[in-house]
Amino acid sequence: MAAPRFSFSLSTLALACMAAVPQTRADESDQPTTYSVTPSQMVQGGVGLWQTPTARMMPEGALSMSYTDNQEYRFMSVSLQLFPWMEATARYTDVRTRLYSNVADFSGDQTLKDKGLDVKFRLWEESYYLPDISVGFRDFGGTGFFESEFVNASKAVGPFDFHLGLGWGHLGYQNDITNPFCELRDSFCERPDGFSGRGGKVDYQNFFKGPMAVFGGVEYQTPLEGLSFKAEFEGNNYQQDRAGALEQDSRWNFGAVYRWNNFDFSLNYQRGNTIGFGVSYKLNMHTVSQVKIDNPPREIQGIKPPENAAAVNRQKLYNDLRRHGGYVITDLEIDDDQATFYGLQTRYRDRNEGVERVGRILASELPESIKQYHLVEQSNNVPMVDTVIDADTFREHATYSVPESNVEDTYRRVSPTQQQVDAYEPHRATGAFFSTKFFWTQTFGNPEDFYLYQIGLLSSVGYKFNEHLGIYGGIRTTLLDNFDKFNFTVDAEEAFLPRVRTRVREYVTGPMITLDTVFMQWSDRLADNWYYQGYGGYLETMFGGVGGEIMYRPIDSNFAFGVDINYVKQRDPDSTTAFMDYSAVTGFASAYYQPDFLPDTRIRASVGQFLAKDRGINIDFAKRFDSGIVVGAFASFTNVSSEEYGEGSFTKGFYVSVPLDLFILQPATGRGQFPWVPIARDGGQMLNRPVQLIGTTEMRSPFLD
């Protein structure tokens, strides 16, 4: 018997959408409510039941990493609650019934892998009378395996959470409801069939087109802590699946979720014939932290400071600031009524904690006649910011003389004066230095093997000729990798774009010890708020050349602007020092903005010419959480068409920047960054400059910390 179809007019849709209009909130008691069922992940990742999403969201900052197995498919997903009203999910799908390719020499017997991205937006937050209402787009930037759009609602009633939604595309193939948008335009009545082989392109022309179906379900939180049950009625008929037409004996799916600590374990029965299971790990990037073993800030009550500046034990002051305040001094001036300390905070990434600890040391070891402490922090021997501490106000704070005193009330941040810049004479401005750190390069979804990695040591060495000029180098030593599985270098086809990045495999599969970078750099302050640098040498793994940059960055401003220009040549992957014939001029005008309407975010827009001489814009969006973790995404849009670009359609990627002190028991500065670029082609590629002024001037208007 054919499934019943239901008419769904535009007027009905309009009445449903009216629930999302703020003016309907007429009763003051109609406030957001809480619900007893904790949202859990669906099979493909993202908050939902089993195969269908719900309108629910995780708490802001929540991150869920999931693995699920459902016979024909395996899913590995990461879901992130960027804002209270926005969820984003990235997913890899392993299609067990399909090969990656039919060329055994290229991908062997590896099964087909696919990448997908989902987003969901909350339109209305649940209140006493009204449900959560959300709209979402699944697999909107991939090859379309699970491409679909949906609108749904969720309402909690005691231990139950009810969900009802409308789906298009993969969520609507049951076609049991008439698509109301057909009344607007005939093109909405049909949805293009098949899957996109190129991927990476947003098929917005497919949105809300074609068949439409109802889906929904219920969750029940049992009296047993951590155990909940989920039942759903789904809208897919499984006849257009990438794994092939799958048998569906029932539209009902059932299962249970058991939560233990930060883990969710799930077991489900789907389609009336398939058993699946999964596990999710959750953490919150706002609240994640690490216990610290550290001495408390110095108590100054009862301590008698020196009578005058001449009585200050400078060597003890140097040592105490470094050992107990994390502040390394490079120059020092003590006058009758003020003291200036040029240096760098190397331990406490929390600004207030650093000021608190340093201020207590200064208050105990400097005479009371000194009324101001100036902490002039420098970057690459260029003074960047002057933290001016009012000594009397700070003493009142540190001795608890003022109730509910806040350290922020004791200091202000200003730009260093020209007099301070001219007076700066750093100790040990010249000399050699050496450091070593681990590197870990990884890539997912490759034809040779799903996961490829390279682990090793990056040894940095340099020599400073003076406070402005230095030579720097990096040597990579590979300790462990499986990059030898790479079997593709350059195909025989004539490429539309120069091979500026697609030859990367030739660069990473060379000798165990390689020369990564060697370059000279000059950097200085041009004027108040203006900074510049020039550099030349082997600038990155694949390119060398010369370049320069200038940046405008006011103190504690939401806005910064910079321009860089570079002439580069491509390095020869078969030689340590030689270059190839290809050369290019590349550079950008970049604007950085931290909007007040999106707290803890930064947007960068860079307009210019890329390595392959294509022109356009690169946009980067970053979100910082309370723990200091930063999550970002970027994309390049150029005058190269998606067909000319190739697989992926355009350059895009994601990254996570994690503070070092989340992993260790001691306070520390420094970060590790983990990038993910789904497809790296030649269009929209920027030069990986070894030093960028946005990083050098970070303390001028901190975003990362």
Predicted features by range, described:
Residues 65, 76-80, 117-121, 151-155, ...:
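Residues on the lipid-exposed face of transmembrane beta-strands in outer-membrane beta-barrel proteins
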Residues 298-304, 320-328, 370-433, 441, ...:
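Polar/charged, Gly/Pro-rich intrinsically disordered segments
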Residues 288-335:
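N-proximal, solvent-exposed amphipathic alpha-helical segments enriched in charged/polar residues
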